């Protein structure tokens, strides 16, 4: 497929995943505004926060935890499993249960745990059993409208949480920083959208480099969850193998595992997501780690996050990755939306 022939993308992209990616900046802004308006009852003092969810419904919490890591004064963890950890108990614990469909069994398990343990709880979803049970239990529900895959609703999963934390008084108003971020995203988007030719489109060129390779995404600091997002987008959108690694931890193990089996070395591709706002030593580590990979014969590249703030850099790196994963899917002649193995597993689990 010629990536310059963007009018033919719809022959592969039968459910228009491209539209969802194009709309991410607007979705992020819409979600924050919605979250500032939805009903929120008064809450008791909070000493810990747990966000329970899976997949595309959990990544927004990952992103928020990373974004706020330098300013949030209470512990905030993302829980991807069934029963909540033992410390999630009592009125001083806030449990946020997020499920796009409202039927995710792990999220439902976490919700029931939270109610049993007397936690303050709020539900974020489009519908399903989760909202039904929340309404019966008298738990606040933040319902949003979105038709599509959970991974395409990352603006909602992040933006609603950003508004929630603002309204709880955990962080200052984010309106100005969000407006700046949307501007950065819009300017980036103008350079990487589908109608921009390959010669001028760095996202399309990057996708071309990934074809036939096993992709490893490296990041550090607050960009670590963006590396996870790149990995999961490659899995779900391009139906391709990918892993993510976090610096500095990867320098204490992964770096030693790049030699064997020797015949696979040249099938690897290491992508480094850089931030000018990261810890100076991590910036050095990212550069040195990339050098070592190159010396071992592994192809590498990097993306420098755009903007001057953590929020802008977080989201610009995410948006660029979403476009790269999409163009990779097109080059693989793969529909970006359907995920048959995941659907099959869910059906098997409910049989």
What are these regions (language model features)?
Residues 33-34, 73, 164-174, 238-239, ...:
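Short helix-capping/linker segments at secondary-structure and domain boundaries
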Residues 337-350:
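Short, small/acidic-rich helices and loops at N termini and domain boundaries
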Residues 13-20, 27, 35, 39, ...:
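Active-site phosphate/pyrophosphate-binding segments
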Residues 255-340:
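C-terminal active-site/capping subdomain that shapes the small-molecule cofactor and substrate pocket
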Residues 44-188, 208, 275-299:
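Glycine-rich phosphate-binding loops that contact phosphosugars or nucleotide phosphates
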Residues 1-16:
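Polybasic, low-complexity association/targeting segments
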Residues 79-80, 240-252, 299-308:
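A generic structural motif
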